[in-house]
A protein has these predicted regions:
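Signal-transducing coupling segments at domain and membrane junctions
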Residues: 1-18
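Conserved long alpha-helical elements within nucleotide-processing catalytic cores of c-di-GMP signaling
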Residues: 86-105, 115-142, 148-152, 156-160, ...
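A short, aliphatic-rich beta-strand micro-motif
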Residues: 17-25
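Allosteric cytosolic regulatory segments
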Residues: 53-60
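Cyclic nucleotide signaling catalytic output domains
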Residues: 147, 193-202, 208-223, 229-250
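Catalytic core regions of nucleotide second-messenger enzymes
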Residues: 149, 178-193, 221
């Protein structure tokens, strides 16, 4: 029945030929509605009401199971501390995007000397730093961007499009906020080493895209930390020939 419903909602339901709403409840918690529509508006028979109650019962448990599955799935792809997507999901999403042939850019942010930060100020303060960084990263994302906590002190940002200049500008702006803006009340002035790699211009698949961005960060650390390195072919050769400058770009 439509008793207890506002006149506006009742009018809309009648226009849709809905003659009743069955509330789906589990352990007294409302989890959904079953709308009952009938074109001739004739009263339901006792058998029809009984059948609808059975449908409602099974629908309640089906919806409950679906919610449990979604909650479990969400937990399996989410980092507990930051609510960002986790490392496992990063590999899944990046592989999937590259397999589809969609051009993309991958940014890695690595907090310099995070282990020392934890040792000096304690794990609680370290967790607070990670949470603050995650919050700022989330606030900076565009609609199609995705952020992941890749390791204890590393974040990944996946962006659609392989425009290196745009990703550099985005990263520089984000790092400015992380190190000098909203993080100014932190006990330690942090620095962040960043890497950028792109698909398909440089990387051929998702695994190589991740490997290349890790290499960019690695060489950024070698350059003294706090740098932004764009991965170029031949970057690894710097370890044999430090004079090679065309293989990478230091910002």
């Amino acid at each position: 029945a439509l008793d207890g419903i506002s006149s506006h909602t009742r009018s809309w339901l009648i226009q849709q030929n809905i003659i009743g709403v069955y509330c789906l409840k589990y352990n007294r918690a409302l989890i959904g509605f079953l709308f009952i529509a009938r074109h001739n508006h004739m009263p339901l028979s006792a058998d029809q009401v009984s059948a609808l109650c059975k449908i409602g019962f099974y629908a309640t448990h089906a919806l409950r199971n679906a919610n449990l599955y979604m909650n479990a799935y969400r937990a399996s792809i989410t980092d507990d501390l930051t609510a960002l997507y986790n490392r496992k999901h990063a590999f899944e999403i990046i592989d999937e995007l590259c397999l589809s042939g969609t051009p993309c850019s991958l940014i890695m942010l690595d907090i310099d000397d995070f282990k020392l930060y934890n040792e000096l100020y304690g794990s609680k303060e370290g967790d607070h730093l990670i949470q603050r960084c995650a919050k700022i990263i989330l606030s900076a994302l565009d609609a199609d961007d995705m952020a992941f906590r890749f390791s204890a002190d590393e974040f990944l940002i996946l962006r659609h499009g392989s425009d290196v200049a745009a990703s550099k500008a985005f990263t520089q702006s984000l790092v400015e906020v992380l190190t000098k803006g909203s993080m100014s009340d932190m006990v330690w002035e942090i620095t962040i080493t960043c890497g950028i790699s792109v698909f398909p211009d440089i990387s051929v698949d998702g695994r190589e895209l991740i490997h290349n961005v890790e290499q960019a960060v690695y060489f950024g650390k070698l350059d003294g930390k706090g740098h932004l390195i764009v991965y170029r072919k031949g970057l690894e050769n710097r370890s044999q020939n430090p004079d090679i400058r065309t293989a990478y770009e230091r910002v």
